[in-house]
């Protein structure tokens, strides 16, 4: 449930980049929706990420593999899909299934890079695990730093709109006293800059993971960021009357089964204000990292990849919040890659790409071989799109989510979805618990489920996409362990 930005300093032969081995700055932002000005959100004030997007390639159709923190982060770092690593919840570590997996940072270390982490790259329970190693993978790093700021000591001040739930999952927020640098994410930026300053003089290049905790709940940021978003300007997303009537029950996350958590509109608007405030706060920390790259004379030998672990609902479909769905808002995720002197820099890419593509992209750019073993990486390099964002691609994206049995569902249900340029097809329990089809050419907000009363064209599309989906994702509940309370 987070957002990631990856900055990589890499060597490139025959594509115009520096001949020396590049450094990698890998920045992850938690729970970041594409609610950024560079992605067309006119409310957001995100000048630093916007500037990064303008200097790199902004992927407008990038999709995560499972919109929940632990599975998606494990998938990115291993380059493997959830069905391969058997991670669907917040408790299972990918090494339980693939103990010999070679992670992205491990591959760089094996080829002469120093690899370190500041903050959240793998899963953390937020805010409980802030200041610890969280659900880390020790073989992935040579050094780790786990800052803990005043947001931890100020937790008793946080407003919780849903007191019956923990602040980790509830709509909760705090307009905090103090400076950016006192907050955990401000400290993360500070520590990352210190490491870059030290490592710039080392003989070995660095791969530095920088993981920010916000805008994950609770939405905590200094007061000045809340002031940037007057409450009068906050509007909840439009949804037509009866929007939910054609949507299967399983499509709604078990932790958000009723519209807006039954909260009133004013409270939801305050939550929206708080989300945008934390978004701008994290944007400022990204700006500090970018400024440090310039100041330390590292920018020309650094690739930047900015991404979040998944998308995020902000009230769409008449009251969906947070993640854990297969709708566009949860599956689609920010992804920006800036490679020095890449021909595609400054251009947006509308091709369909997946987060399993990040790993092979970075190894390709660095001229590294992917790890050998019984399991091959399951994505493909985006290097051709960094050269020419308009290049032919023929991409599809697969996203899954596992539902526990509850009052709504008599038994667990696997959901899986495939996104093409025009269509999104989703089925639940292989169709036994519902099917969805949305035509993004006519219905980009996914209001009209064509699978309910399909015409001949819709029937043909569903048949074709179901076959493609079955090739890459199981519709069955896994036989490996999972914790129903942590899905």
Q: Language model features by range: what are they?
A:
Residues 472-473:
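C-terminal tail/extension regions appended to the core domain(s) of diverse proteins
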């Amino acid at each position: 449930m987070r957002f990631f930005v990856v900055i990589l300093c890499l060597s490139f032969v025959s594509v115009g980049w520096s001949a020396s081995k590049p450094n990698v700055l890998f920045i992850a932002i938690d729970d970041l929706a594409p609610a950024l000005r560079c992605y067309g959100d006119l409310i957001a004030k995100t000048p630093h990420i916007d500037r990064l997007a303008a200097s790199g390639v902004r992927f407008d159709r990038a999709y995560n593999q499972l919109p929940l923190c632990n599975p998606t982060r494990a998938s990115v770092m291993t380059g493997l899909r959830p069905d391969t690593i058997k991670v669907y919840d917040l408790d299972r570590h990918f090494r339980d299934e693939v103990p010999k997996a070679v992670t992205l940072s491990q591959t760089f270390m094996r080829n002469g890079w120093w690899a370190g982490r500041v903050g959240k790259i793998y899963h953390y329970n937020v805010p409980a695990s802030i200041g610890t190693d969280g659900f880390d993978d020790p073989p992935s790093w040579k050094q780790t730093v786990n800052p803990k700021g005043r947001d931890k000591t100020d937790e008793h001040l946080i407003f919780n709109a849903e007191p019956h739930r923990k602040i980790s999952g509830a709509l909760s927020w705090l307009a905090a006293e103090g400076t950016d640098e006192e907050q955990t994410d401000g400290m993360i930026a500070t520590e990352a800059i210190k490491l870059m300053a030290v490592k710039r003089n080392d003989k070995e290049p660095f791969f530095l993971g920088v993981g920010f905790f916000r805008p994950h709940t609770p939405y905590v940021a200094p007061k000045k960021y809340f002031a940037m978003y007057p409450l009068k300007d906050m509007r909840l997303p439009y949804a037509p009357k009866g929007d939910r009537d054609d949507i299967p029950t399983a499509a709604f996350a078990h932790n958000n089964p009723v519209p807006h958590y039954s909260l009133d509109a004013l409270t939801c608007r305050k939550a929206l204000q708080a989300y945008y405030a934390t978004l701008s706060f994290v944007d400022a920390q990204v700006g500090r990292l970018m400024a440090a790259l310039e100041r330390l004379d590292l920018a020309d030998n650094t690739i930047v990849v900015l991404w979040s672990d998944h998308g995020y609902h902000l009230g769409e479909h008449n009251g969906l919040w947070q993640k854990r769905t297969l709708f566009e808002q949860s599956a689609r995720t920010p992804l920006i890659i800036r490679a020095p002197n890449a021909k595609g820099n400054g251009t947006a890419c509308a091709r369909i790409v997946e987060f399993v593509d990040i790993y092979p992209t970075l190894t390709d750019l660095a001229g590294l071989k992917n790890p050998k073993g019984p399991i091959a990486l399951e994505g493909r390099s985006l290097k051709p799109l960094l050269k020419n964002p308009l290049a032919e691609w023929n991409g599809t994206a697969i996203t899954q989510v596992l539902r526990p049995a509850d009052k709504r569902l008599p038994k667990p249900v696997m959901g899986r979805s495939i996104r093409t340029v025009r269509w999104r097809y989703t089925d639940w329990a292989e169709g036994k618990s519902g099917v969805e089809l949305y035509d993004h050419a006519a219905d980009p907000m996914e209001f009209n489920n064509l699978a309910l009363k399909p015409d001949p064209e819709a029937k043909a599309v569903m048949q074709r996409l179901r076959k493609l989906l079955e090739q890459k994702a199981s519709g069955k509940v896994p036989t490996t362990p999972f914790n129903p309370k942590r899905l």
